[in-house]
């Protein structure tokens, strides 16, 4: 009995460490989290609802002058600034930002599905790969996916 208890304890510890070692890495936007068809729908919605302010090439809107420099009225949705702003954050944060604040003068106008489609287009535009499953329109299903600007190794 004295030997059995330590052996059981050791086996339990081995099981705990083994399960930690085989845990999957968190999903990222590099894992194909949207479909090409979804991004195509999102592109049409983007052009209709977003391009007037954020630009056809998702470059943002830099039309106000303050002193000698132009300041962006609305931020870019592509490129280094966009990637840097969202790097390391949860995809649910970006989805929620879009859902709560856009379109600028009609927040909440778009359905969750439309917001997911637009986000899929933004990801495609930023050269993240499409996959086989659509990006979920339920924000709680996006809390396990990280926005990583550089593809993990």
Please provide the spans of the model-predicted regions.
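Gly/Gly-Pro-rich "capping" loops immediately C-terminal to redox-active cysteine motifs
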Residues: 33, 58-96
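Electrostatic cytochrome c docking/interface patches
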Residues: 21-45, 61, 106
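Protein kinase-like catalytic domain
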Residues: 54, 78, 102, 123-126
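The canonical Cys-X-X-Cys-His
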Residues: 42, 46-57, 118, 122
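Sequence context surrounding c-type heme c attachment/ligation sites in exported
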Residues: 40-48, 88, 112
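Flexible coil segments in periplasmic/lumen-exposed cytochrome c-class electron-transfer proteins
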Residues: 107-153
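General structural signal for alpha-helix termini and helix-helix connectors
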Residues: 79, 83, 100-108
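N-terminal export/targeting leaders of redox proteins
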Residues: 1-33, 140-153
């Amino acid at each position: 009995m004295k030997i059995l208890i330590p052996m059981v304890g050791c086996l339990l510890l081995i099981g705990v460490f083994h399960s930690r070692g085989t845990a999957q890495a968190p999903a990222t936007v590099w894992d194909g989290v949207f479909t090409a068809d979804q991004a195509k729908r999102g592109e049409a919605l983007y052009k209709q609802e977003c391009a007037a302010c954020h630009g056809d090439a998702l470059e943002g809107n830099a039309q106000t002058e303050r002193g000698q420099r132009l300041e962006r009225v609305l931020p870019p949705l592509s490129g280094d600034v966009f990637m840097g702003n969202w790097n390391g954050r949860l995809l649910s944060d970006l989805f929620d930002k879009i859902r709560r604040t856009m379109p600028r003068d009609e927040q909440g106008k778009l359905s969750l599905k439309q917001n997911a489609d637009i986000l899929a287009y933004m990801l495609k535009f930023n050269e993240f790969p499409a996959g086989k499953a659509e990006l979920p329109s339920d924000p709680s299903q996006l809390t396990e996916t990280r926005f990583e600007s550089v593809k993990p190794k």
